[in-house]
């Protein structure tokens, strides 16, 4: 039954309007063109980096609408419930890319804990996911992976990373939520 949604477009797209389907069709047609995709990514990165005011609305009405359920747990639940009617689970993914500040790692840890609380007892959200780089700098993982002697500040930094893992894993265990 679960795979039937991927084999039968009537099931897969039953909840979509003609307008939503046409929009998705043209978006995917554009994405399959490497030149358009590369130019689009470059333009998006440039406009985001330079704080162009209109970018947020364009992204929300295109990519975000197609690939995301919402900006908050509550907002996303409409999509989660709709998908679960067809036996498709959802995940709440929270990621901060390229940040290296301890406060950001702590905020990410707290956000993952909120995701765990929200997923608890909800079969429509079968697991919670996070990236290791949300808990610490890639460089500290590399140093630990090389098994080199860490400096005092690196040891303290690694201890904070480990503490974030322990907090999140313990909470997930206590609430019977799968982590990935």
Indicate where each model-derived feature is located.
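Alpha/beta catalytic barrel-like cores
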Residues: 2-177
